[in-house]
Regions:
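Active-site bordering "gate/hinge" segments
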Residues: 1-227
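Positively charged, low-complexity/disordered segments
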Residues: 286, 290-301
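Residues that form or flank phosphate/diphosphate-binding pockets in enzymes
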Residues: 36, 240, 297
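Dual-mode signal for accessory low-complexity, basic/Gly-rich regions
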Residues: 256-288
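A short, sequence-level motif marking secondary-structure junctions
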Residues: 197-203, 261-262, 300-301
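Short, glycine-/Ser/Thr-/acidic-enriched flexible segments
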Residues: 33-34, 97-99, 138, 200, ...
Length: 301
């Protein structure tokens, strides 16, 4: 049976998030999601009189490419993607995953090379298109959240089909508070962290770039972060599962990092000179995320 919520979500992404208009070229990027998701997005773009361009991806295929990746190979792929992105007005990505740790055995050196090669493509998308990215609910994600698949799907659509425009007043108030905040002090079990926001403006996010949404974000003054923070929720990064993450800061830099996989997290933090510094601090007005929020399933930027 067709789920009408898929059509609702597609229309929201097209009409509200990316505001597709007549003649807009829209890249629809689907990763491990059912074909009917791409079909719903195509129809929504056509309804808006846009021009859909579709790419379908499979994580197993991508993993194999990365494991055997060469610089020459990804120079070609990166150029191909960048050239196409320069032709686009809008970009919508829907990312599912049958196995959230599928890329866990891709060598870190290979992963870092691929990410570096693809960075100009991502920068073009972020800076020069109207874009929105989101996850697609899968059994793998439901398992991570400790929920049944149907219950997780209901949760997903509940938070993704919000009237995000109605959140703007509350988010505006939060933005004003963050704009005038000079220092943040976070305390909790295993956590005592301080940093400055002085002189840095917050940005309110109302369902335009990431779904689900409802946050205001800023960034700490680079060298102001001091103390320790411990995370009570698991996360997946580059296909590797991390839990019990603890970070210690001095003069803004992570000087010690431990987790269930301490070696892997430090390899990531050593991948470039900026990786040991915090790039974002955010507060959310999204109160509908309850215990399910333990699952780290928000989209990548």
């Amino acid at each position: 049976m067709h789920d009408s919520r898929v059509d609702q979500l597609a229309r929201q992404l097209v009409r509200y998030s990316t505001q597709v208009k007549k003649g807009d070229r829209v890249w629809i990027d689907c990763f491990d999601v059912p074909n009917y998701v791409a079909v719903a997005l195509i129809r929504a773009v056509v309804e808006a009189k846009g021009l859909p361009v579709v790419k379908l991806h499979d994580t197993l295929v991508s993993r194999e490419l990365m494991i055997h990746a060469s610089e020459e190979q990804y120079d070609i792929l990166a150029k191909n993607n960048l050239d196409l992105m320069k032709e686009m007005d809008c970009y919508i990505a829907v990312r599912g995953s049958h196995n959230i740790t599928e890329n866990s055995d891709v060598p870190a050196k290979q992963m870092q090379m691929v990410m570096a090669k693809m960075r100009p493509f991502m920068n073009e998308r972020v800076n020069n298109t109207r874009w929105c990215v989101l996850r697609w609910p899968t059994s793998s994600m439901a398992q991570q959240a400790g929920m049944s698949t149907p219950a997780f799907e209901d949760f997903f659509f509940k938070v993704c089909l919000l009237d995000y425009a109605a959140l703007i007043p509350a988010m505006t108030a939060l933005k004003k508070l963050m704009d005038k905040t000079k220092e943040v002090h976070i305390t909790g079990p295993g956590t005592d962290l301080k940093f400055s926001l002085k002189g840095l403006k917050a940005i309110a996010c109302g369902g335009k770039h990431n779904i689900p949404d409802g946050e205001c974000f800023s960034a700490p003054v680079k060298d102001s972060v001091e103390g320790v923070i411990s995370y009570n929720a698991p996360t997946i990064y580059q296909g590797i599962a991390f839990d019990n993450v603890k970070l210690e800061f001095s003069q803004g830099k992570i000087v010690k990092a431990t987790a269930n996989n301490t070696e892997a997290i430090n390899k990531i933090l050593d991948s470039d000179e900026g990786a040991r510094y915090i790039g974002e601090f955010a507060r959310s007005e999204e109160r509908r995320v309850g215990k399910e929020g333990r699952s780290r399933w928000s989209p990548d930027h």
